[in-house]
């Protein structure tokens, strides 16, 4: 599956901004069929960063991925690249 089909778009909510600042995480809407390994690989290839952990949440047919980045890759820098900040 293509990286751009796996990662649909980043989420910019109050909770996602709080997670970005406190836990070095970004939240993405992802394809419902994508698993954690696929999401991790797609994010690492798209943004050239190291991902520590991926948690997923499925609700009402939509899937969110909570991606935690390594300390050397601040989530705020990635959010700035995406235009979220």
Segments predicted by a language model, with ranges:
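Contiguous, often N-terminal, cationic amphipathic patches that form binding interfaces
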Residues: 1-85
């Amino acid at each position: 599956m293509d990286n751009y089909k796996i990662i649909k778009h980043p989420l910019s909510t109050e909770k996602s901004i709080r997670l970005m600042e406190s836990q070095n995480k970004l939240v993405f809407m992802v394809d419902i069929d994508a698993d954690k390994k696929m999401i991790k690989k797609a994010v690492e290839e798209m943004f050239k960063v190291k991902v520590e952990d991926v948690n997923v949440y499925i609700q009402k047919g939509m899937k969110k991925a909570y991606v935690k980045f390594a300390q050397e890759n601040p989530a705020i820098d990635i959010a700035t690249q995406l235009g979220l900040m």
